Amino acid sequence: MQQYILNQRRLSRETLLLVFLTFSAFGVLAQNSYRNELGGRITKTQFEEQILTGPYFGVPGDQEGEMVLVYRMPVGKVENPEIFYEKTGNQEAFSQNKNLIVVYYPGPDECNSNSGDFDANAMKKAAKSLDKWAEKHNAVAPIYVYKNYGGLLAYEEFMNWQADPDGVFEAEFFSYPYPCKSFVVLHPSGEYRAILGDFPLSQIEVALKKLNRANR
């Protein structure tokens, strides 16, 4: 099973250190090596410090026993943004220069199964805020995408969840099962802003504003 180390405010420093010790125990035979988000080699101490103090996850690398830092707030540009509009049935929105707001749910995990943010009333309130921001900041109605449907039944009345179409969002933005949920806001220019793993809802509006400002 793939494992990841997560950096969240609601987790204590002691909890994170316990996770690190667990990784160390399982990694003795594998001779773990560590890399930063650019692929450069770093020490275990540097790896752990980045997760404890910065916006990073630690995820398994391509090689056995390798752990790699992943920056939680990626900003970039995709080569073919139109495919994401097509896969979600929003071709017209692409031609109208509208943003896509995508909330990605990996499936039930310890984070979203025990978070007050996933209370039905909290989710309903969040959905209303996203609808309002979408209309205000030139975006299509929010798109709710899942990898594993488990745990979503309680939100069906006010959120239209759909399977990740052909896995395009996982492949491009969410290659690991980042905890709780993640989001990406995509502009027709291909520019995007995302947060991997649990996030303050207000950051979606921040992303919309920044993308609109950059693409005037």
Regions found by a protein language model. Give the residues of each.
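Thiol-/selenol-based redox modules, centered on thioredoxin-like
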Residues: 188-193, 197-216
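Non-globular targeting/processing and membrane-anchoring segments
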Residues: 31-134, 140, 146-148, 216
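Short, solvent-exposed loop/turn and secondary-structure capping segments
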Residues: 112-115, 155-156, 196-197
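Bacterial Sec-dependent N-terminal signal peptides
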Residues: 1-35
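Thioredoxin-like thiol-disulfide oxidoreductase module
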Residues: 149-178
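Thiol/disulfide oxidoreductase modules built on the thioredoxin-like
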Residues: 170-199
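Short, solvent-exposed loop/turn segments at secondary-structure junctions
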Residues: 106-109, 149-151, 191, 200
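Acidic carboxylate-rich catalytic motifs and surrounding loops in phosphoryl-/glycosyl-chemistry enzymes
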Residues: 145-150, 196
